[in-house]
Regions:
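Noncatalytic, solvent-exposed loop/strand surfaces
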Residues: 1-132
Length: 132
């Protein structure tokens, strides 16, 4: 195998691995940065950082949902982000609980299941629940 690129100390994940869509990685990078760790978009072919948005926290997680990135922030907000290398674009946000959230949310049947260190939560995210 051939190493294509390497960035020491710049793309360090704390708890979770990034998700991949259309040749780009979307993940929380910033081992040791606690609540300030950014969500970044990285071009897989070159390692180039396309954009970075601070404030998600190193302990959060990312999952692909409907072609977008759902981020479980380290302090409770669930944030839906457009999976695009052009720019960071927040599509929706829900503060479901506080405390430390270090687990990956699960999406199934139009529902989002998440938890923190003290409680679990289920959010109905189906289009019928939004009044559409």
């Amino acid at each position: 195998s051939t190493q294509l690129w390497r960035q020491e100390g710049k793309l360090m994940n704390h708890w979770t691995t990034p998700v991949c869509k259309d040749g780009y990685l979307y993940g929380l990078y910033g081992h040791g940065k606690s609540d300030s760790a950014p969500l970044k978009c990285i071009e897989i072919a070159t390692g180039k950082e396309m954009w970075s948005q601070d404030g998600f926290g190193a302990g959060g997680a990312t999952v692909l949902v409907g072609g977008n990135v759902l981020v479980q922030s380290a302090r409770g907000p669930l944030v839906l982000v457009e999976a695009s290398p052009k720019a960071f674009r927040e599509l929706a946000r829900a503060q479901i609980f506080g405390g430390q959230c270090w687990t990956m949310p699960v999406v199934s049947g139009g529902k989002i299941f998440a938890r923190n260190t003290k409680e679990g939560f289920c959010l109905d995210a189906s289009s019928s629940s939004s009044g559409e």
